[in-house]
């Protein structure tokens, strides 16, 4: 799965909001409508999802110098491999390879290197 990347510097809309029918609530999404997730234990510079984890959980990335915009306040953090990842409340944001349609939240509650949670703004 290709990882969406902002190409221009400055501000860029990288997130939206949609209803996840399986969760019966609104979730934060990428610009393609795919649900965004956080991983328990990842916050303030601590990364657990690295290496092969990133195949199932692609990070939401932007180009260096880009200010991410969305329906909520977003930030950025530099990943261990040097890429810039979008954050919500200090937690890095990811999509899930098991979601292929808008509004799906198939990664909610999954446990591997921690527990994954759909972001509910």
PLM segments and residue spans:
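Compact beta-sheet-dominated domain cores in extracellular/mature segments
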Residues: 3-121
């Amino acid at each position: 799965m290709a990882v969406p990347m902002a190409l221009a510097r400055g501000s860029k809309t990288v997130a939206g909001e949609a209803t996840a029918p399986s969760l019966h609530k609104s979730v934060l999404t990428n610009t393609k409508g795919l649900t965004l997730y956080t991983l328990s234990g990842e916050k303030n510079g601590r990364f657990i999802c690295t290496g092969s984890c990133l195949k199932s959980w692609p990070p939401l990335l932007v180009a260096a110098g880009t200010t991410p915009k969305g329906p909520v306040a977003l930030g950025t953090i530099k990943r261990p491999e040097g890429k810039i990842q979008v954050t919500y409340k200090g937690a890095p944001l990811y999509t899930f390879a098991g979601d292929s349609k808008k509004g799906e939240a198939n990664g909610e509650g999954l446990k591997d290197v921690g527990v994954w949670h759909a972001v509910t703004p």
